[in-house]
Amino acid sequence: MSTSHKHNTPQMAAITLLGLLLVASSIDIAGAQSIGVCYGMLGNNLPNHWEVIQLYKSRNIGRLRLYDPNHGALQALKGSNIEVMLGLPNSDVKHIASGMEHARWWVQKNVKDFWPDVKIKYIAVGNEISPVTGTSYLTSFLTPAMVNIYKAIGEAGLGNNIKVSTSVDMTLIGNSYPPSQGSFRNDARWFVDAIVGFLRDTRAPLLVNIYPYFSYSGNPGQISLPYSLFTAPNVVVQDGSRQYRNLFDAMLDSVYAALERSGGASVGIVVSESGWPSAGAFGATYDNAATYLRNLIQHAKEGSPRKPGPIETYIFAMFDENNKNPELEKHFGLFSPNKQPKYNINFGVSGGVWDSSVETNATASLVSEM
């Protein structure tokens, strides 16, 4: 005992505390790996691609969604170890569906030429294509385009590395309440069933854009702000044995239920977009956005009542983009165009929103005192 007591010096205590801080940091980083951020480029004042990727790395953001195969961004991603959801834009869907030669060319130029230096995890063929929106003219081409890209990925020898899917929004859901009764719209079933069948057969997830903000702002009389921000103190929806305290889970689980009803019980979900604007419309405030993002990052580690476990989630978006419309769309960024954080979010720390200088300064002080 005397020997043990003899070595219990302030220096040893500092070393022990530093070790605990480093261990805690590594655990938090691992826990935050379910989170990525969407890299949109619709602004005339955004940083260059190299600066953006360095910002991802410095903030411990390990996943990125890219909406089109921008070669400048892909070059900057080389060697970064950031996992990428690579978009095939709506404007290319019809062309890719028209023949395998086009799919092979697209995969060669935008995937294989950058592999394995860029860790492409998904190809998102199209974004929010739907028979009930202005993209209905593309619906008959979507699944054929997905099939062609899937075949081209396989021919390139990357079939075990890259999954092919598409990103949809909640307009395809006909019934979402209660979540266990979730189902796709009858007038979209022909479209959805083809997608679900493809994903089931290729063991790929469905990519879903989930925005509690729009549900709340469109119906504030029926949907409360706390329920939308993950801050409801009590259960809001009792669905059999499942209890819902936040709208995000209810929306997510309604899609899972809809998938099961469409023969896709084995199909997983990746949340390909979620966010909250800080200005520009009803309910879009700095405080609401900070609260939602902080809680989303924490909640993504936990899962939903129907599907416990980490939820791979991509926050929309990295920057405020001043060329987007309407006004609301300009204010979804985690960062301002000058790379200054709007909310001091760091993805390597549990809880999401914090001042990164706190731990850095504390660790530096410990080291200086040893």
From Swiss-Prot:
Glycosylation sites: 361
GO molecular function annotation: glucan endo-1,3-beta-D-glucosidase activity
Prosequence residues removed at maturation: 349-370
Protein name: Glucan endo-1,3-beta-glucosidase, basic vacuolar isoform GGIB50
One GO BP: defense response
Native source species: Nicotiana tabacum (Common tobacco)
GO cellular component term, pick one: vacuole
Family: Belongs to the glycosyl hydrolase 17 family.
E.C. number(s) listed in UniProt: 3.2.1.39
Keyword Signal: yes
Tissues in which the UniProt entry reports expression: Is expressed primarily in epidermal cell of healthy plant, and following induction by ethylene, accumulates in mesophyll cells.
Predominant location: other
Induction: By ethylene and salicylic acid.
Database matches in Gene3D superfamilies: Glycosidases (3.20.20.80)
Modified sites of kind Pyrrolidone carboxylic acid: 33
